[in-house]
């Protein structure tokens, strides 16, 4: 029998010939062979979603290729990275699966059949940089683009601004159009959906509105959290959702939070949004930020050294949008000064342009330090579990300011406060927001702290 790695390399090579580039890079390339016994090969994959995809779509192909190569029946046994780490947690060394997919940036193929989909042709799977914080979301999006209306319906992305939710949503639509140019795809923001509904009611064209939204193959709705408190919109969308779901049409939604955390969202909508798969997207780590910048620089034809990219990535840890904005500002500064892009030039450009994020020094630890000093409590108190009022209110204010003044995700804020659940952060933010309307003392405290942090 072939050795484990030899057999794996042969199987990978064969699959690469048969599968699309994106499918291979997403599901096969990150996989790692751990052990080969007589009848099975144990393979590690990044997430449960990867394992499900392998078991449904790739296991039989694996066995066929192995049979041809060894004349033996060998089946793949999938194990997730987390499961493997639990099994080997007593060991010091850990296998690194890689945060970035490592694919070279490619020029996106612009579909020539954009019609009225409102899809951005630049938002494709090819232009999406995969990292630890978005790996599962990317894999789920790819599955949905290949098998809409079957496996994950609805697909619900949630996370902070500028992390790639909209990019993945558009990538699904663009991929489906490449596969079937006749597909009827509708992309809309929640605000546009509401405005179109209001207009339809005013002009008495509700039936035309329903016809437009209930006869699509793929419905993409961005920022669903803005449906909160809009009863008529929720009522209409409830029936639209049902019509599409019952007809096996794919629905993809995005939000800055989980369905059950959206205030004043009808329980029946919350329930339906949970029928499929909810996937969070978290801020990119350093390696992913560098890869994002390199990808953007290559696409834009910007000449920039690797150490300079690393410097930019080290300055900004909030989101992709701000990263790309920083690169654009650096490019403009370089042109204005007719100078090549260097680390020194980048430092000057970002300083003079007052870029936010780390450069403004407003971070969660800084907020905690200011709040602790203001209320005469300790940092340990803010991060601890004490429930007395003298501690709880400063802690909630610190969480509120972390949500308002940084781009950090809810889970990250929770982690900075001693591993609190993200729902605790939401509760704190909502409570302070409500109290600020009537509590003059609280208004002064929050105002003082905000002024200190922004000065």
From Swiss-Prot:
GO terms for biological process: DNA replication initiation; regulation of DNA replication. The keyword tRNA processing does not apply. GO terms for molecular function: ATP binding; ATP hydrolysis activity; DNA replication origin binding; lipid binding. Residues 84-107 are annotated as: Disordered. One of its GO terms (cellular component) is cytoplasm. SMART domains: AAA, Bac_DnaA_C. Residues 84-93 have a biased composition (Basic and acidic residues). Coiled coil: none annotated. Residues 335-455 are annotated as: Domain IV, binds dsDNA. Keywords: ATP-binding, Cytoplasm, DNA replication, DNA-binding, Lipid-binding, Nucleotide-binding. It is found in: Cytoplasm. Residues 75-117 are annotated as: Domain II. Domain I is involved in oligomerization and binding regulators, domain II is flexibile and of varying length in different bacteria, domain III forms the AAA+ region, while domain IV binds dsDNA. HAMAP family: DnaA_bact. This is Chromosomal replication initiator protein DnaA. The lineage of its organism: Bacteria, Bacillati, Bacillota, Bacilli, Lactobacillales.
């Amino acid at each position: 029998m072939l050795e484990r790695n030899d057999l794996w390399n042969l199987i990978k090579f064969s699959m690469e010939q048969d599968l699309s580039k994106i499918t291979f890079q997403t599901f096969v390339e990150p996989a790692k062979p751990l052990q080969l016994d007589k009848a099975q090969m144990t393979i590690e994959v990044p997430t449960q979603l990867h394992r499900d995809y392998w078991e449904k779509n790739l296991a039989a192909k694996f066995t066929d290729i192995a049979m041809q190569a060894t004349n033996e029946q060998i089946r793949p046994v999938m194990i997730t990275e987390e499961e493997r780490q639990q099994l080997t947690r007593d060991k010091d060394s850990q296998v690194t699966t890689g945060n970035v997919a490592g694919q070279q940036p490619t020029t996106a193929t612009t579909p020539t059949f954009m019609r009225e989909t409102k899809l951005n042709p630049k938002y494709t799977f090819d232009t999406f940089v995969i990292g630890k914080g978005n790996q599962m979301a990317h894999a789920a999006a790819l599955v949905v683009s290949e098998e809409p209306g079957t496996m994950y319906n609805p697909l619900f992305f949630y996370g902070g601004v500028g992390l790639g939710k909209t990019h993945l949503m558009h990538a699904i639509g663009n991929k489906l159009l490449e596969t079937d140019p006749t597909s009827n795809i509708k992309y809309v923001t929640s605000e546009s959906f509401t405005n179109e509904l209001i207009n339809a009611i005013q002009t008495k064209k509700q039936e035309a509105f329903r016809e437009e939204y209930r006869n699509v193959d793929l419905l993409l709705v961005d920022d669903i959290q803005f449906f909160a408190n809009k009863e008529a919109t929720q009522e209409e969308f409830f029936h639209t959702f049902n019509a599409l779901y019952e007809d096996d049409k794919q629905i993809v939604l995005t939000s800055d939070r989980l369905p059950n955390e959206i205030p004043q969202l009808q329980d029946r909508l919350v329930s339906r949004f949970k029928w499929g798969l909810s996937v969070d997207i978290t801020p990119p780590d350093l390696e992913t930020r560098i890869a994002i910048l390199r990808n953007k620089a290559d696409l834009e034809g910007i000449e920039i050294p690797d150490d300079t990219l690393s410097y930019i990535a080290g300055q900004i840890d909030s989101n992709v949008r701000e990263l790309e904005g920083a690169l654009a500002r650096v490019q403009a500064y370089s042109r204005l000064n007719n100078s090549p892009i260097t680390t020194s030039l980048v430092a000057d450009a970002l300083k003079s342009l007052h870029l936010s994020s780390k450069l403004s020094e407003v971070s969660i630890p800084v907020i905690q330090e200011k709040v602790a000093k203001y209320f005469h409590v300790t940092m340990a108190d803010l991060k601890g579990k004490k429930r007395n009022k003298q501690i709880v209110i400063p802690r909630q204010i610190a969480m509120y300011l972390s949500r308002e003044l940084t781009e950090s995700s809810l889970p990250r804020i929770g982690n900075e406060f001693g591993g609190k659940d993200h729902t605790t952060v939401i509760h704190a933010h909502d409570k302070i927001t409500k109290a600020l309307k009537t509590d003059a003392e609280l208004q002064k405290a929050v105002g003082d702290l905000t002024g200190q942090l922004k000065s």
